[in-house]
Amino acid sequence: MTSDGSFLMRREALQRVSPDLLADIVTSACDIALVVSPGRVVESVMVNPQFGSAERFAAWQGARLSQLFSPESAQKLENRLADGPEPGRSLQLELTHAADAFTLPVRYTITRSGEDGTLLLIGRDMQPLAEVQQQLVKAQLALERDYEAQREIETRYRVLLEAHPAPLLIVSMSTGRIADLNLAAAAMIGATRAELIDAPVGQELDGRRRGEFLENLAKIAGSDPLGAVELTIRRSRRKVTVTATLFRAAGDRLLLCRLGEAEARRTRVDDTVELSERLFLKGIDAMVFLDADGTIRAANDAFLYLTDAGSAALVQGRSFADFLSRGAVDLNVLLDNVKRIGHLRHYVTRLNTDFSGQVTVELSATLFHDRATPTIALVIRDSNLADATRIMPGMASNEGLRNVMQMVGYATLRDIVSETTEIIEKMCIETALELTGNNRVAAAELLSLSRQSLYVKLRKFGLLSKDAE
């Protein structure tokens, strides 16, 4: 024996072994063996009886070696044989036999004879290993499908839970802790969802001890699905009613609890919500809800009628500046004032219609900042008819205009028009300052004047000292 554990045998001793016995030894040590001439022609095929019958591979004898393999395996074999093996050394390759009737993966140990270059290919059938690998791949694919199905179910569950308008809690009967809840329930309790997950339900809902509370809910869920328990939310001391549904999941009993307002409060809230919805849908004044950046979230039919819009879908998502005659200037004045003081009254402007028309309107705005996303509500009225009734009394009460009226018959028309122009100019500047909350930069934008021109006119009409006061 050599140092690496292999055995040495003299050639003379090996020659004393009969060829038939040597063939039996080779076939018993492998599944299939090929003897290939230097010209790459198969001279002999030896098959282990447990692997298959020799007739199955009889056609291989006399065939070219490359014809026995798939094109990829034949090319791989040629490339490796071009580089080796050296006589007395071997190389291992995994090759695939591709015949008309079958495909056979085999791992070959290839040895080259030192005398004439004859090749001996000793092969082991890789079909069992390939089948195991295929089963592993199928199992992996099945696991991935199960994982995707589980994710889909979890997504559907989460969407259903969050889309339900009622506050919902899922409570474990064994631990008395909150297993899950939707955002509506978290908002009603007055905490975040992360704070309430796995929190003891008895610490959030005050009424009875934990055991009595859960047993009472389970009893109601089993006997009267419409029954309810009145409890108090500890954080806000708010009265709520709790209805429950009992179910099992993963061996644990769970309660699906629906939180609702106490009856008296719920009746008042429901009435208010219903009346508000009716006012929005059927009111004669146009109503619009905006995001904080001026994007339209909702608009009623009166607004669609006022702007000649075809449908609410064509309005939602557009900037309200698209409907203002002064565009972004009007919108910035509106948003700045509403965000600063929370509301805006009697803001007069013009709305553009979808057919290049304009309507003079008066709008009021209110900011709802106590929501997750701040919302601005607008009430818009057509002021074309009201202008005539409002302007004349104002004109009669304005000292400058009364003086102009008294000039008729005592001054030329040119002088009267010049005096009127200055009065109207002063009134416009005062109105712009009032609308912008004395913000001169915004007033200049509103009047399409430069800041320098506005200051000149303020000094001209004595409004600088008035603003300082």
UniProtKB/Swiss-Prot annotation:
The organism of origin for this protein: Rhodobacter capsulatus (Rhodopseudomonas capsulata)
GO biological-process terms attached to the record: carotenoid biosynthetic process; chlorophyll biosynthetic process; photosynthesis
NCBIfam families: PpsR-CrtJ
Alphabetized PROSITE patterns for the sequence: PAS
GO terms, molecular function: sequence-specific DNA binding
UniProt pathway: Carotenoid biosynthesis; spheroidene biosynthesis
Signal peptide: none
Pfam families linked: HTH_8, PAS_8, PAS_9
Keywords (A to Z) from UniProt: Carotenoid biosynthesis, Chlorophyll biosynthesis, Photosynthesis
Identification of the protein by name: Protein CrtJ
Domain PAS positions: 153-225
Superkingdom of the source species: Bacteria
CDD domains, sorted: PAS
InterPro entries: Homeodomain-like_sf (IPR009057), HTH_Fis (IPR002197), PAS (IPR000014), PAS-like_dom_sf (IPR035965), Tscrpt_reg_PpsR-CrtJ (IPR011785)
